[in-house]
Swiss-Prot record:
InterPro entries: AlphaKG_dependent_hydroxylases, GBBH-like_N, GBBH-like_N_sf, TauD-like_sf, TauD/TfdA-like
Location(s), subcellular: Cytoplasm
GO MF term (any one): trimethyllysine dioxygenase activity
Family to which this protein belongs: Belongs to the gamma-BBH/TMLD family.
Protein name according to UniProt: Trimethyllysine dioxygenase
GO cellular component: mitochondrion
GO biological process, one term: carnitine biosynthetic process
Top-level division of the source organism's lineage: Eukaryota
EC nos: 1.14.11.8
Role this protein plays: Converts trimethyllysine (TML) into hydroxytrimethyllysine (HTML).
Family annotation (Pfam families): GBBH-like_N, TauD
Organism: Neurospora crassa (strain ATCC 24698 / 74-OR23-1A / CBS 708.71 / DSM 1257 / FGSC 987)
Amino acid sequence: MRPQVVGAILRSRAVVSRQPLSRTHIFAAVTVAKSSSPAQNSRRTFSSSFRRLYEPKAEITAEGLELSPPQAVTGGKRTVLPNFWLRDNCRCTKCVNQDTLQRNFNTFAIPSDIHPTKVEATKENVTVQWSDNHTSTYPWPFLSFYLTSNARGHENDQISLWGSEAGSRPPTVSFPRVMASDQGVADLTAMIKEFGFCFVKDTPHDDPDVTRQLLERIAFIRVTHYGGFYDFTPDLAMADTAYTNLALPAHTDTTYFTDPAGLQAFHLLEHKAAPSRPPPPPPPPPPPSEEKEAAGSAAGEAAAAAEGGKSLLVDGFNAARILKEEDPRAYEILSSVRLPWHASGNEGITIAPDKLYPVLELNEDTGELHRVRWNNDDRGVVPFGEKYSPSEWYEAARKWDGILRRKSSELWVQLEPGKPLIFDNWRVLHGRSAFSGIRRICGGYINRDDFISRWRNTNYPRSEVLPRVTG
């Protein structure tokens, strides 16, 4: 589906739609506003296309239960659900621990020839008496889903794509709201899920521990070879260019992990001039005509003592969309050629993923872009493949790099104390311009799975979340 344009308007969280299948939009800007309507503040719900039209039926056959649900269903894949599968998916209090929601029976102790001896269908559910004298009750929504689908997929994950225009009114929530209630966490995680990043305004910045507490409202902070929560200045404490004052091109972090960091946060606590060195001996006084020029030059040097360091954000999913439209073959190469990645600059550290991974990782079920893994500095040797040569990969990567560097792709923002930035490291590439002076930044990583769990449970009722994760 081609992206559709979304205007640059102020939108409440409730207006940020979660419609199925409409995965991508072009995004201009968004800021969270507190809704005045109780209905607008209610949690999202997963949509259902079933309508009550028929009398329910359940009949015993040699293959399993032949089912006719009380709702009209379209795109049916089967009419019979197998006996053993049904018995294994009984969720009564005897079969599933209601506190942990884990099975508490041995699936393979069930007789392989298990079969129903009695079946009763109502408009709400189907009750089965099994040949092992166990009784199971299955809600129709569960049965109907597997009559029309093979497996549970991910939640509706509509995203909004953006470029440089997103800087006009970027996604923003307030620190007091996030810390005060799960509704605030819902706002924050929904913004990150849809747009890939969010600012948290009004965050205290005199104590970095407050930023740690903010991140822990989402989930625990991930510990890596860099430590956990970080608070650093450009002193090369670790052998990584992030610990310098050099410019950094757009990249994702931790490409060298099997499971790259899900979220990353930056909070600029301070940016000040570097401590002055002992002054050199004064030069001879300039001629009067040059005094004004020399004074202006000195003022310029003083002003540059704490400048630069703008942060760069690039929507990797939008860049991939552009690449696919402009050069489908380059997209195919970058999504199929698997590369080595590594972190080995520090003594005693040689980290690499469990296998080679492509720059653009696709969802195996849907074929949609799932994750961007791009840091040319951490990339290993391009392999010789049977389908594509290294030269072909380099040409495709050159086009990818060119898209990332387009002005229309780059969102430049100046971080400031009191306004942390949290972004999706699987989607949004980040970088910075070179800077002078001393910058102190704190932040941390959060695992992707923990972020998504928090997003689910603050944005949707648990009764709707559970079927999505348990099947």
